[in-house]
């Protein structure tokens, strides 16, 4: 009986070793492809929120990490991609979190030019209700295009609210919480950029260590 148990243990051990080796080999073979796909997805989003004619640098490489929960909605450092054109700063793409979505965090990226005018907004991830709150997704509706060309005049700019709250942005029928959360998050991101633009340009490019 002991011999049988030893054999079973040996078989299990060999199986575990083989499984671990398979996972390791699979990861080694696919990690470069996964990294490439992630980079291409990032490039696509960056070019959607910061137009190509606005920059001539490699945005994904010109990245700084900024930790500011009040402005960017997260305790974790968030990436900000700095655009430049002909060697001059020309805007940024700012990742931020709207922590008060109906179903939890909504991750967004906000593009701005050097005058802090919005050049694009995209929702990177969310868990909002299909058919209601998911209208923030560009694949569902063009609602986020309502931010284009707008800026924040001051920290108390009352235009930056949904119409139900006296602001300029549409809400959704039966789903006010979601657009309200996104509007507030975009406002905070734009105001942060507007008031920290020069400081951002002095930070070290450090997103590769994220």
Swiss-Prot record:
The keyword Cell membrane applies. Its EC number is 7.-.-.-. It is found in: Cell inner membrane. GO terms for molecular function: electron transfer activity; FMN binding. Belongs to the RnfG family. Part of a membrane-bound complex that couples electron transfer with translocation of ions across the membrane. This is Ion-translocating oxidoreductase complex subunit G. It comes from Aliivibrio fischeri (strain ATCC 700601 / ES114) (Vibrio fischeri). The gene is rnfG.
């Amino acid at each position: 009986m002991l011999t049988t148990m030893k054999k079973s243990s040996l078989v299990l051990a060999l199986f575990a070793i083989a499984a671990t080796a398979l996972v390791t080999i699979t990861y080694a073979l696919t990690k470069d492809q996964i990294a490439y796909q992630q980079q291409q997805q990032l490039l696509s989003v960056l070019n959607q929120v910061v137009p190509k004619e606005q920059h001539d640098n490699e945005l994904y490489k010109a990245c700084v990490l900024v930790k500011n929960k009040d402005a960017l909605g997260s305790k974790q450092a968030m990436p900000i991609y700095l655009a430049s054109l002909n060697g001059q700063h020309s805007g940024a793409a700012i990742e931020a979190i709207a922590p008060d979505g109906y179903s939890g965090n909504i991750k967004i990226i906000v593009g701005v030019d050097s005058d802090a005018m919005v050049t694009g907004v995209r929702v990177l991830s969310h868990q909002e209700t299909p058919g209601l709150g998911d209208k923030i997704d560009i694949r569902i509706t063009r609602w986020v295009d309502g931010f284009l060309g707008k800026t924040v005049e001051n920290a108390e700019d009352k235009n930056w609210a949904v119409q139900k709250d006296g602001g300029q942005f549409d809400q959704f029928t039966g789903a006010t919480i979601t657009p309200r959360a996104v509007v507030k998050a975009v406002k905070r991101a734009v105001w942060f950029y507007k008031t920290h633009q020069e400081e951002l340009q002095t930070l070290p490019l450090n997103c590769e260590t994220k």
